[in-house]
């Protein structure tokens, strides 16, 4: 049985048990029993930070504690100095930078009397940006002087040159209409008299459409656009395209003003 026992052959490959001096037992207070596998691991094993032998933790802890500058108070090493792995440089831990507030805390009364300077700068920037956006919309000096704010609200009224009184939004009410303030033959009228339709008698007798424009109004518009000027005015007009376009625009404005006058006249009659 002893020869065929597999445990006997497996134990024969291990070195014999290492004997210990039992005189050290009273100093350590316990007996040491070493296994053959632990003895094999202890032989020619490189040093590492991990202790594989649980019976040698006292010696390893003492060695690590002696090499640790943070745990050894007698080493004289400053705790603020950190060593790199290469031990080539010494890095000193600097204190963190303290960021001071730019504006100190002021009492409510002082803040009301003397507001911070940066608030004034922001208000000035907002004022400048509003002026820039105001100029970007194409407002001229006349627009800035007009403070009526009757059409565009807080952005003012945009004047369309000399034909601004012909705008539809300014002639909705006969009491405030600039066209109703002057007659068609007035010197204040910016349009020539020959461009205005003159057959107003037929317009008064005709029936009105649902849109508020009479049947004869549309015929008058077509006749006004096709109407040729007086012979005295033909010599003044040149054959240039620019003057032709200007004349066509004037005729369109004249027909539009004519319809606005009739619309205002009808509204004034209804209110009476």
From Swiss-Prot:
Signal peptide: none annotated. Residues 215-233 have a biased composition (Low complexity). Residues 235-248 have a biased composition (Polar residues). GO terms for cellular component: cell division site; cell tip; cytoplasm; cytosol; nucleus. Transmembrane segments: none annotated. One of its GO terms (biological process) is clathrin-dependent endocytosis. Keywords: Cytoplasm, Nucleus. InterPro entries: Pal1. Pfam families: Pal1 (PF08316). It is found in: Cytoplasm; Nucleus. Its main location: cytoplasm. Residues 193-250 are annotated as: Disordered. Belongs to the pal1 family. This is Uncharacterized protein C6B1.03c. It comes from Schizosaccharomyces pombe (strain 972 / ATCC 24843) (Fission yeast).
């Amino acid at each position: 049985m002893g020869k065929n026992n597999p445990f006997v052959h497996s134990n024969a490959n291990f070195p014999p048990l290492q004997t210990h001096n039992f005189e050290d037992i009273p100093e350590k207070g316990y007996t040491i029993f070493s296994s053959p596998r632990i003895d094999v691991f202890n032989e020619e094993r490189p040093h590492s930070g991990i202790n594989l032998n649980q019976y040698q933790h006292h010696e390893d802890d003492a060695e690590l504690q002696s090499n640790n500058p943070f745990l050894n108070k007698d080493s004289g090493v400053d705790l603020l100095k950190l060593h790199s792995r290469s031990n080539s440089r010494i890095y000193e831990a600097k204190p963190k930078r303290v960021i001071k507030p730019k504006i100190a805390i002021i009492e409510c009364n002082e803040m009301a009397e003397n507001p911070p300077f940066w608030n004034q700068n922001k208000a000035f920037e907002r004022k400048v940006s509003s002026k820039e956006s105001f100029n970007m919309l194409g407002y001229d000096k006349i627009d800035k002087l007009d403070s009526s704010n009757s059409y565009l609200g807080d952005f003012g009224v945009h004047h369309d040159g000399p034909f601004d009184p012909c705008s539809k939004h300014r002639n909705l009410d006969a009491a405030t209409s600039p066209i109703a303030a002057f007659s068609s033959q007035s010197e204040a009228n910016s349009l020539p008299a020959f461009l205005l339709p003159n057959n107003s008698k037929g317009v008064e007798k005709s029936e009105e459409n649902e849109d508020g424009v009479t049947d004869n109004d549309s015929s008058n518009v077509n006749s006004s656009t096709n109407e040729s000027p007086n012979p005295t005015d033909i010599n003044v007009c040149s054959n240039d395209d620019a003057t032709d376009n200007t004349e066509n625009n004037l005729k369109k404005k004249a027909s539009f003003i004519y319809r606005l006058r009739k619309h205002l006249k009808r509204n004034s009659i209804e209110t009476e």
